[in-house]
């Protein structure tokens, strides 16, 4: 079994700023993101939510089978974060900075442009997938949908896979890309998102990708320690 690059059992708070452990500070983003998102979802004062819809939404049928890739998203993102955290710290840093940049942009968008969707159908039937979708609808509100974090997170994983030597073979790349596309499609076939939300998520990814993964060598001095760019952090 492949051993982790760093023995995290040696971590002490006093060593947080050492080169060995300073990437752990990037994990602080997750509680901050969760708190802000929770506030926007549940505690912000009542505001007008702009409905996101386009003509194409009404041509896309609801398909309960897409709840499978939709739910797999959590394992997809969490699994890649865990893998890079254990076995490829530079890739972990770049993936986290990509997430920090794109997710933060999404939060600012939700704050300044509150949005929602009214595309969910009435669910009929008592089979497992329908019941699971009903639970998903109950747990996840229909607000703060554009840009889609499901789409952004999916392509964060794909870009991270491209960044790791062992996943650069065409078979691996195609597998990760296929899953990212399936998850993105699941958001519209489950009526969790409008096509507009997906397109906005893809646009955010396209804008962020060169900032994280294609930083010019001459700009490396402007990048924060533990921060962005392949030139700054050669692969282990």
Language model feature labels by segment:
Residues 2-77, 124-129, 133, 233-236:
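N-terminal transmembrane-helix/juxtamembrane module of multi-pass inner/ER membrane proteins
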Residues 22-26, 30, 67, 94-95, ...:
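Residue-level signature of transmembrane alpha-helical entry/exit and packing/kink sites
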Residues 34-36, 103-111, 178-188:
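Aromatic-anchored segments of alpha-helical transmembrane domains
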Residues 41-57, 85-171, 212, 219-236:
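Membrane-interface loops
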Residues 67-82, 100, 104, 153:
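Hydrophobic alpha-helical transmembrane segments
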Residues 76-81, 154-160, 178-186:
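Hydrophobic, membrane-inserted alpha-helices
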Residues 121-123, 142-146, 182-210:
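Interfacial helix-loop-helix junctions of multi-pass membrane proteins
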Residues 168-181:
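Short hydrophobic alpha-helices at membrane interfaces in multi-pass membrane enzymes
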